[in-house]
Amino acid sequence: MDTILVFSLIITSYNVTKKELRDSSCQVEPLPDLFPKDVRSIRAELIREAQAEAKRPMFIQNQTVAILQCLGSGSKVKVNLVHSEKRQKVKHILKNLRVMTVPCRNSTAPPSCHLTPASKVQAGFLVTGKAFLPGVSQCKVYPVMGASSETYPSTTTSVTPGKKGEKTTKVDGFSSPLNQDTDENLEKRKKWSIVVKVLIAVTLFVSGIAITVFVIFEVPCPSRCQQVRELCQCQRLRRRPRKEDQQPGTAESQSDTQPKKVGQEAPNSSSPKKAVEITVVHQTYF
């Protein structure tokens, strides 16, 4: 029994969620129609936009750039954002997430941000948030990693100037081919595997302790076990007298059968006496 439990624990220890989604990430970059083709560096253009916006009297510091919706299998969701240089009194805000800026190695490459959740995000959960970044007017979200068969969510947002210096956002439809059913199935498998592992471990632990204590060290059973033993002994003692009572009964039955035979033989023994008496009577008449 213990060997079966050990092997079952080894089998269940195998990761049942092997088909879990790979670490996915999303990247936000400006659309190609936003900047002219002759611009060599997008960063320079963003700096120009930032300087132009700084000169305006009505400048909105917190600007909604995109609604980020990414599927991540790990506790960290990586999102690369193209944004302008940081300014004073302007915060990069992402609801329920925190932004960690990473310096760029190449001067021509745009700066990026790693969006890590403030609280740990479990595998398969949909991470949503709004990024408020200055200097970016149009963005799109597309996957950086992933195979050709796997498709990831993509959304485009455009910011257009409105009345009184206000800016509005337009968010396209969010397509998520990765169904949430797969995520729920993975979570259920994880939960059941944990439950099975715990049950097997508990049974192994209890059985191992019982074997080592009562079999190897020969520790006497507690009071309950002694009571059970006494009951078993009483039942055995009750059964023995019954067997002894049955044996004398058979002997008496045999003795009862023997007198019947004697009684049957008695009439035969009395018959000669009668014959003798008859003969004596016949002799007196002569």
UniProtKB/Swiss-Prot annotation:
Keywords: Membrane, Transmembrane, Transmembrane helix
Regions that span the bilayer: 198-218
Gene Ontology CC: membrane
Keyword presence, Transmembrane: yes
UniProt-listed InterPro entries: DUF4711
Bilayer topology: Single-pass membrane protein
Comp. bias regions, Polar residues: 247-257
UniProt xrefs under Pfam families: DUF4711 (PF15829)
Region of interest (Disordered), ranges: 152-182, 239-278
Compartments (UniProt record): Membrane
Protein's recorded name: Uncharacterized protein C17orf78 homolog
